[in-house]
Structure formats: structure tokens, C-alpha cells
UniProtKB/Swiss-Prot annotation:
The protein's name: Protein PES4
Predominant subcellular localization, coarse grouping: nucleus
Domain RRM: 91-169, 179-247, 303-379, 393-471
Alphabetized InterPro entries for the sequence: Nucleotide-bd_a/b_plait_sf, RBD_domain_sf, RRM_dom, RRM_dom_euk
Chain segments carrying region Disordered: 37-81
Species in which this protein is naturally found: Saccharomyces cerevisiae (strain ATCC 204508 / S288c) (Baker's yeast)
Organism taxonomic ancestry: Eukaryota, Fungi, Dikarya, Ascomycota, Saccharomycotina
Keyword Glycosyltransferase: no
Subcellular location: Nucleus
Length: 611
């Protein structure tokens, strides 16, 4: 008969204008009978402590109102007396560390044994609708809420310990100064030390709002309601044996508290005997690789390992979760994302035996599709050198032939999309007629690629050797010798191997073929007949390539021979085997024919045969 709206019903509209005064009592009774449904709404907001999640959450039952207490019980009024506007203040609890399979129905089934239990909510990701791992409980009775918290806190639900604490909306109160106690060096590998045991141990000293253990670092936190209780616990347990292991404890200051302007003033007001947490494992200031201090936080220790080839999206939490499986971690240093396609890190374990386990277990292990390199970390000085080497890496080259000059090295790098910082040939050995030099690269990865390609490879008649340090006996460059006396073409296309470095990658089959002949192969083909045959074939190719209109006198036999000798000496370093391999490719590759043609034209011009 009556509709519910936001407007209060006018009592005058319910009274007839001609009603008699003696009918007043009857109208009142009729009114009470007719107004039987009157909703009372009591909203309970979630704990804003967990509002830092990236996405908003919603109830797993989206069709029902969240945290609404609706009184639609007809028995709510007795003997005709209206009680519909009465409401009780609910007691909210926060429940965390929920397994992903825990639903609101799961929680209702667990807490329904408490008569004053009203409702449960599991917070969900607004997009994926998956559990965020926490939720809220509502009780009508405070004593029953505390009883439920005491009985069920840190018990397992679907295989995971749940954590129940008061839902504190006041941030200042929740982070009450000096009540959060930090414990380090806890023996969390002891199966007897569970979170429930840890909770029971300290709850007898005072009310605990929350406690947590982290086996990845062997640390724990107990958040007391009272500051005096926290100080007493620290005095009793600091530097004492706990489950057979000496532990340390002190006041922990939350990051938000440490950032307030008057933090130091507040800290100075603490009791002089109060111990403040000194060990800040995985301190925030060391979380970024670009901090200068972070490069010096690792002492020379047998507890540290070096990890290379991590995916570029790796975070410190990823490393902590993955590498703590073998033992608790003390600290992590993760490099910044650079131009290279991987990250590297230093991880320091609390126990040296765990670092040994990590090397054996994780070296050559695939992590998110990348094969890891895990080794013993170097000492402080060596580590500093390595970090510096990531900026500019220098590769030293020895035993270079005249062919392997600066121009050749430049094109070699260009083909592989490598931009060297500097290329220099600065040494010459008179005995072997070879050169030495170095290439500076912008990163270690580029240097490694050229190192692997050139090391022990035959190029232009000499086997190149590469190293990360200059040889002590490396000959120095002399003005009387060196590449300045070797003819350098103004056309790079005619230099040996240009066609391979320009048209093919470092792994080109042509490059592998031309460089695959080792010294034993060369010794098998050291006879005059073979050399003569190759040179005769080469001279015929030179004769065919001479343009009579441009170089008329060059076609004479003696001049053809001179041009062929010039090319053989200048461009091929008198290497018969390499020249023979090149000639075998002429008929199958027009490009090779073009290279030889340009060599012939430049040689003829240099020798003065041009018209």
C-alpha cells in the first residue's frame, strides 16, 4: 500500500480530513501494522590498508549489496512496537593470505559457527574476477569477533595459512609509532616454527594486530597494539636463542613513517633502551641498479653469486621468489635495463652453503625461456671492473694479416649492426709480418659476438687471436712498417672478404668456407704445381677482365702478369688457398666476378696502364 522512496512519508496524507478525535488511537495501531518493511542500511567500508592494489575489487556476488545489513525480520517488532530504525554497529575483520580457491561461500562455511557472524567478502580483480588474496568479515559481537580471530588465525584453509586482523581504517593508528617488531635470523627451516606458533609465542605478552613470517629472508614481523609491549618483547628476545638459533629483533619503521618530515624527532623520543632495527634486508635504496651506493654494498664474500642472462622484464621480487628456494637471501643487486637483451644480478645468501647449492642448481637452468649463467661472485674490486665493462668493452686483436685492416673490421661490424666505439691498428710484428690492434664496443654483448667470430679464425692467411687484455709482449707500431705501406683501396668493395661481410652475415657459409682451412690443411697443399696452376688460372681471369678500350697496353702478356701479381700480393696477401677458393666461386656468383673486376681496374690504374 505504501511505496519506499527517499522522501519521508507525510503523516497528513494518511489521515482523512473528517476523522474524529476519538478515532486517533485506532489510526495509530493501523499505521504500525501497515508499515512492516523498513530497511536499515549499515555500510561497512573495506580496510584501506589494501587499497594500494592496482585494480579495484568487487564482491564475488555482484548481484547482492556489499556490507549491507537489511532488517526485514517481521519478528523484529514485538507487541506492535516498532523497532525498525534500530541498528547495531558491526565489527569488521580483515582476512588475508587467502588461497586463490577460497570464495565467500568457503568463508561463510568456516565462520557460521559463531552466532554473531553476519557476512564475508572476498575481494576480486575488477577485470579478471580472480581473488586478490584478501577479504573482510563482519560480526555483530566484538567478543565473538576476537574469539574467532584467536581460534582461527594462522590456521590452514585450502592448504594455506590465513591471517586475520582488525580492519583498521585509520592509517595513523594502524602504523602506530614503535609497535612493529622486526625479527631476523629466524630458523624458519625448522618445521616446528609455524606462523601459528610464532603468534602464540608473543600473544601472551600483549594483543597482536598482525604477525608475518618470510622464509625467503628468514625474517618476521609482529605488530603489537601497545608500544610498551613491543619494547618489552625486544628486551626479552634480542640476541637470545629462539628454537635453537640466535635471533635479533628491534623496532621496524614502515616506509611511510620513515618518509614523514618529523621522523627523526619522533624516533628520538623513544626510550633509550629501545633497540631500533639495524638490519634492513633488501633496503629500498638498493632496489635500483643506478644507485651509486648499491655498487658498494657487497663485500667480498663466499655467500654471493653472479647471475647473467636474466630476461629484461625480471624484477627483484622475481629473483627473490625464485632463488630463495635454496635458502634465505640477504640482499639483491639487479642491473638496469640496457641496450643488451638481458639483465644480470648479484644475490647474497645468508649462508655460504646455500650459495653453493644455487650455483649447482641454477647454472644452465632455463628461467622464463632464457638460459642462466650462475657463477661464484667476484670480490669487490673484480665486480667493480665487471660493472664498468658493461659500459665500454675493449677487444684486443693479435696476428692480423694486412687484409684484416681497419676497413675490413669496420665493415665486419657494420654487417652485424654493431657500432664500434673505436677501431685502431697500433702494432706490427716484423718476424711474422702481422699486426695487432683493438676494438672498443659500446657494450659487452657486441664485444662477445666479435670475439667468438674472430678468435682462432683464419683471415687473409693469418689465424687471428682475440683476448680481453693486451698481451704484454705485443709489438708496438713503427713508422717504417705497418699498414700505411700496404695499398689501401679507395673502393672497399675490391678488398678480400668485403663481398662476404657486405652480402652475408658472420655465419655466412662463404665466410666459413674461406676461413675453415687450418694450418694442417695448408701443409698438405704446399707444392709448386698446385701454386702454379692456381696462379695460371687467376692470370687468365685477369686477362679476361681487362678493358682494352680503357687499358690498351695492359693486355700485353708481361703486363697481364704484372697486374695479376699486384692483385695477388696486395689484395690476397699471396695466400694461394684463399685465392683458389675465391676462384672456385666465380662461375657461381656474378657478385664475385664484379669484385674481381674492380680489383683489376684499380690495379691497372695504380700501375699506370690507364689511357
Amino acid at each position: 500500500m505504501y511505496s519506499i522512496s527517499n522522501k519521508k512519508p507525510s503523516i497528513l496524507s494518511m489521515v482523512p480530513l473528517n476523522i474524529l478525535k476519538n478515532q486517533d488511537l485506532k489510526v495509530k495501531k493501523d499505521q504500525e501494522k501497515k508499515i512492516s518493511f523498513n530497511p536499515v542500511v549499515t555500510p561497512i567500508r573495506p580496510d584501506d590498508y589494501h587499497e594500494k592494489t592496482s585494480r579495484s575489487s568487487s564482491s564475488s556476488h555482484s548481484d547482492s549489496p556489499e556490507f549491507l545489513r537489511i532488517n526485514n525480520n517481521k519478528s523484529g517488532h514485538k507487541n506492535g512496537k516498532l523497532k525498525s530504525f534500530e541498528s547495531k554497529k558491526l565489527v569488521p575483520l580483515f582476512i588475508g593470505d587467502l588461497h586463490e580457491t577460497v570464495t565467500e561461500e568457503t568463508l561463510k562455511g568456516i565462520f557460521k559457527k559463531y552466532p554473531s557472524f553476519v557476512s564475508a567478502k572476498v575481494c576480486l580483480d575488477s577485470v579478471t574476477k580472480k581473488s586478490l588474496g584478501h577479504g573482510y568479515l563482519n560480526f555483530e559481537d566484538k567478543e565473538e569477533a576476537e574469539k574467532a580471530m584467536e581460534e582461527l588465525n594462522y590456521t590452514k584453509v585450502n592448504g594455506k595459512e590465513i591471517r586475520i586482523m582488525p580492519s583498521l581504517r585509520n592509517t595513523t593508528f594502524r602504523k602506530n609509532f614503535g609497535t612493529n617488531v622486526f625479527f631476523s635470523n629466524l630458523p624458519l627451516n625448522n618445521p616446528l616454527l609455524t606462523t601459528r606458533v610464532f603468534y602464540d609465542t608473543f600473544s601472551r605478552y600483549g594483543k597482536i594486530l598482525s604477525c608475518k613470517l618470510d622464509s625467503r629472508k628468514d625474517i618476521g614481523f609482529v605488530y603489537f597494539e601497545d608500544e610498551k609491549t613491543a619494547r618489552n618483547v625486544i628486551k626479552m628476545y634480542n640476541n637470545t636463542s629462539f628454537f635453537g638459533k640466535k635471533i635479533l629483533c628491534g623496532i621496524h619503521f614502515d616506509k611511510e613513517v620513515r618518509s614523514v618530515p618529523n621522523f627523526e624527532t619522533q624516533k628520538s623520543r623513544l626510550d633509550a633502551e629501545t633497540i631500533i632495527e639495524k638490519e634492513q634486508s633488501l633496503n629500498e635504496k638498493h632496489s635500483k641498479g643506478n644507485d651509486k651506493e648499491s655498487k658498494n654494498i657487497y663485500s667480498s664474500s663466499q655467500n654471493s653469486i653472479f647471475i647473467k642472462n636474466l630476461p629484461t622484464i625480471t624484477t627483484r621480487d622475481d629473483i627473490l621468489n625464485f632463488f630463495s628456494e635454496v635458502g634465505p637471501i640477504k640482499s639483491i643487486y639487479l642491473s638496469n635495463a640496457t641496450k643488451v637483451k638481458y639483465l644480470w644480478a648479484f644475490v647474497t645468501y645468508k649462508n655460504s652453503s646455500d650459495s653453493e647449492k644455487a650455483i649447482k642448481r641454477y647454472n644452465n637452468f632455463y628461467f622464463r625461456g632464457k638460459k642462466l649463467l650462475v657463477t661464484r661472485a667476484q670480490d669487490k674490486e673484480e665486480r667493480a671492473k665487471f660493472i664498468e665493462s658493461q659500459k665500454i668493452s675493449t677487444l684486443f686483436l693479435e696476428n692480423l694479416s694486412a687484409v684484416c685492416n681497419k676497413e675490413f673490421l669496420k665493415y665486419l661490424c657494420h654487417q652485424e649492426n654493431i657500432r664500434p666505439f673505436k677501431i685502431q691498428i697500433d702494432g706490427y710484428d716484423e718476424n711474422s709480418s702481422t699486426y695487432s690492434g683493438f676494438i672498443k664496443f659500446r657494450n659487452f654483448e657486441d664485444a662477445t659476438r666479435i670475439f667468438n667470430f674472430l678468435n682462432n679464425r683464419l683471415v687473409g692467411g693469418s689465424i687471428v687471436t682475440t683476448s680481453w687484455e693486451r698481451q704484454n709482449n705485443a709489438p708496438k707500431y713503427h713508422d717504417g712498417y705497418g699498414m700505411r705501406n700496404i695499398h689501401t683501396s679507395s673502393h672497399p668493395q675490391i678488398t678480400p672478404y668485403y663481398q662476404y661481410s657486405h652480402a652475408n652475415s658472420l655465419n655466412s657459409p662463404h665466410m666459413r668456407d674461406l676461413s675453415s682451412m687450418n694450418s694442417s690443411t695448408r701443409s698438405l697443399i704446399k707444392n709448386k704445381n698446385f701454386n702454379k696452376k692456381v696462379l695460371e688460372t687467376f692470370e687468365k681471369q685477369v686477362r679476361r677482365g681487362i678493358d682494352f678500350m680503357r687499358f690498351p697496353s695492359a693486355t700485353r702478356d708481361e703486363n697481364v702478369h704484372g697486374i695479376a701479381e699486384y692483385i695477388f700480393d696486395t689484395y690476397w696477401n699471396r695466400d694461394v688457398l684463399i685465392l683458389d677458393k675465391f676462384l672456385s666461386l666465380l662461375n657461381s656468383s656474378p657478385y664475385h666476378e664484379g669484385v674481381l673486376q674492380k680489383q683489376i681496374e684499380e690495379a691497372a690504374s695504380s700501375l699506370g696502364f690507364k689511357r
